[in-house]
Amino acid sequence: MTGSMASSAPTSSAAKNDSVVTAAVLVIGDEILSGRTKDKNIGYIADFLTDIGIDLKEVRIVPDEEPEIVAAVNALRSRYTYLFTTGGIGPTHDDITAECVAKAFGVALEHHPQAVEIMRARLAQTGGEMNEARMRMTRVPKGATLVLNKISAAPGFWIGNVIVMAGIPSVMQAMLDYVAPQLKTGAKMLSQSIRADCREGDIGTELGAIAKTHADVVIGSYPFVDEKNLANTNVVVRSRDPQKLTAAKVAIEAMLTRVKAGLAKA
């Protein structure tokens, strides 16, 4: 897809379907990589997408460097149904996401008339000046559609399958709400959690065997320290098929009963 022109965002709500819809998140910013700013967006986006039937498959964090951003945009947009980016659309010299996305798509960067109008209207209310820095925030790649929000006058944008959002969590969340009705969504991933009441090492082999016989189900084990300060495990079973989910859950519960009975005799 590198260097090709893509259509702008759809203008009507997308219907749900039974196919798998995937996404990646690209976090842009030196401040994240340096540790100065702690990311608060990845987990929110993951929960949001899961709830509407989109599988988040990959997350990358890149610095404010054009080659890194362009390469990541092209790699991720070609691999997944959607790419969501956060950060780098502010008024300063190091906010270069718009330029980089335009370069990735091989199109010009231009001031969007609606973005300029929104910015001027907000500044008229606040008494601010429409200066060069604020004009930077009205630039989008040619052909992009604005991603509006109720919090900030500065919009994000959507071009092809790339949705560019702010890094500020409250603004990002408002932008995500704005685009959600237009996203293609798939069948939701169902999930069940089972408390094992034994250590992960006690069930690892048996759990692996169950995973092999239930190949259409994702099975994960997550150790934790319980309220008695003992090593414990949560087993999480995930599938789009409720019957397959139930079958795997029953098999795991039966295995746990056997294992715990054996441990009690030891």
Regions found by a protein language model. Give the residues of each.
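N-terminal amphipathic/basic leader segments beginning at the initiator methionine
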Residues: 1-22
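An accessory alpha-helical subdomain
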Residues: 161-255
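Glycine-rich phosphate/diphosphate-binding loop of Rossmann-like nucleotide-binding domains
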Residues: 17-59, 63-64, 243-250
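Short beta->alpha linker loops
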Residues: 61-64, 114, 135, 198
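Proline/glycine-rich low-complexity loops and linkers
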Residues: 68-74, 95-186
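Conserved short beta-strand edge segments in small beta-sheet-based binding/regulatory domains
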Residues: 255-266
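Glycine-rich beta-strand-to-loop/alpha-helix junction loops that act as flexible
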Residues: 28-30, 85-93, 167, 222, ...
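N-terminal small/polar loop signature for handling phosphorylated ligands or for N-terminal nucleophile
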Residues: 43-96, 103, 124
